[in-house]
A protein has these predicted regions:
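Catalytic cores of phosphodiester-bond-cleaving enzymes
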Residues: 10
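Active-site loop segments of alpha/beta catalytic cores
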Residues: 1-3, 14, 18, 38-45, ...
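Acidic/polar active-site rim loop that often engages polyanionic ligands
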Residues: 49-56
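Glycine-rich loop at the start of a catalytic domain that most often binds anionic cofactors/ligands
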Residues: 1, 25-38
Length: 191
C-alpha cells in the first residue's frame, strides 16, 4: 500500500490499483494436480475434462486468503487516500476457466471442445459475481475486467463469440445490476 500510494503521489497519476484478484482459481482448483501431476496450489492447468470440473471445490470467499489480503489493501488505501479512485483487476468467468485449464489446453478446448470450455466458464460464474460484489461493497470505485485477452494473447472474434461472449455478457450484467461500476478493457474489435 505504501508503495502504491507513494508512487501515485510522486508521479501524480490518478487512481490506485489495489491488485489483480486471482483467488478463484486457487481456491477452487488449488488442491488438484496439474498436467505434470504436481499440486502447486494456484489452480493453473488442473481441469481437462468434465470429471475435473466436478472435482473443483466450492468457492468460499470467507476462506480465501487472497481476497482477505485484497480487502485489507483496499481498506489501507482508502485510509491513506480517501478521495482517490481505487480499482481492482478481476478475471471474467472465461479467464478463470482459462487459468484452470492452462493456456495450451484452454486454446485447444476453445477450438476442439468448446462445450467443455463453456461448461467450466459457467461453473465459475457465480464465484466471479460474488467476488465482484464483495469488492464493490469494500469501497472500490470500479472493477476492471480485461477481455478477451488471455495472458497477452488475443483470440479471434469467432472463438470469442462461440466460447466466451455469452458468459461475459451474463456475468457483467449481474455485476452491473448489483450497482458496480465496471471497466471492460477490450482487445480488438469486440464491442
Amino acid at each position: 500500500t505504501e508503495c502504491m500510494v507513494g508512487t501515485r503521489r510522486k508521479l501524480g497519476y490518478d487512481g490506485m490499483c489495489a491488485g489483480a484478484y486471482g483467488g478463484i482459481s486457487a481456491m477452487m482448483g488449488g488442491h488438484l494436480p496439474n498436467s505434470e501431476g504436481k499440486i502447486v496450489g494456484d489452480g493453473d492447468d488442473v481441469v481437462h475434462s468434465r470429471e475435473d470440473i466436478e472435482k473443483l471445490r466450492p468457492y468460499d470467499p470467507k476462506k480465501c486468503p487472497m481476497l482477505k489480503n485484497l480487502l485489507k489493501t483496499i481498506e489501507l488505501m482508502r485510509k491513506e487516500e480517501p478521495d482517490e479512485p481505487i480499482y481492482v483487476i478481476l478475471h471474467v468467468p472465461a479467464a478463470v476457466a482459462f487459468t484452470l485449464m492452462g493456456a495450451k489446453p484452454a486454446f485447444k478446448a476453445m477450438v476442439k471442445n468448446p462445450e467443455l470450455f463453456r461448461a467450466l466458464s459457467d461453473h465459475v460464474e457465480d464465484a466471479v459475481v460474488e467476488s465482484s460484489k464483495i469488492l464493490w461493497d469494500a469501497g472500490v470505485d470500479f472493477l476492471w475486467f480485461p477481455m478477451p485477452n488471455f495472458g497477452g494473447y488475443c483470440i479471434s472474434r469467432k472463438t470469442y463469440e462461440k466460447c466466451i461472449s455469452e458468459s461475459n455478457i451474463r456475468a457483467n450484467k449481474r455485476i452491473k445490476d448489483y450497482g458496480a461500476n465496471i471497466v471492460i478493457h477490450t482487445c480488438g474489435p469486440y464491442d
